[in-house]
């Protein structure tokens, strides 16, 4: 096998990457269930085979009632938790933001929200490890 790079291996990775290993929660809104399921399944693979470079993260999604009803967000997160056969990360859940640690740093107008999990990766190391294993 031959690998040709313009610069160093993974040279531009950090500037273009979000460093997230995620399933694409936003794609559920466009009914891209297959894409989300495949992405979540791949996230599980990376979490399983490279735990030394992947860090689970919890995200707080404040609820804005004028944008979407809470039931819709709950339904989306329910699907997100199940589409990829989630086994490694915790399932999502609803929280009261005005009396919990989850609301720290958020504007006081947010009363409730949702917590879901994805993961962050050392993207340059992932590229190098992938190239080495090819």
Name what the model sees in each region.
Residues 1-17:
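Glycine-rich FAD pyrophosphate-binding loop
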Residues 107-114:
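Short glycine/proline-rich turn/loop motifs
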Residues 13-14, 72, 123:
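Alpha-helix N-cap/helix-start motif
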């Amino acid at each position: 096998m031959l690998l040709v790079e313009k610069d160093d291996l993974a040279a531009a990775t950090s500037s273009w990457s979000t460093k997230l290993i995620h399933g694409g929660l936003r794609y559920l809104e466009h009914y891209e269930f297959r894409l989300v399921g495949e992405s979540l399944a791949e996230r599980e693979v990376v979490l399983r085979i490279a735990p030394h470079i992947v860090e689970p993260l919890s995200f707080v999604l404040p609820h804005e009632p004028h944008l979407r009803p809470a039931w819709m967000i709950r339904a989306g997160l329910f699907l997100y938790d199940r589409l990829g056969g989630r086994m490694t990360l915790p399932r999502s859940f609803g929280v009261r933001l005005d009396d919990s640690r989850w609301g720290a740093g958020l504007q006081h107008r947010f009363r409730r929200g949702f917590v879901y999990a994805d993961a962050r990766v050392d993207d340059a190391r992932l590229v190098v490890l992938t190239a080495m294993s090819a």
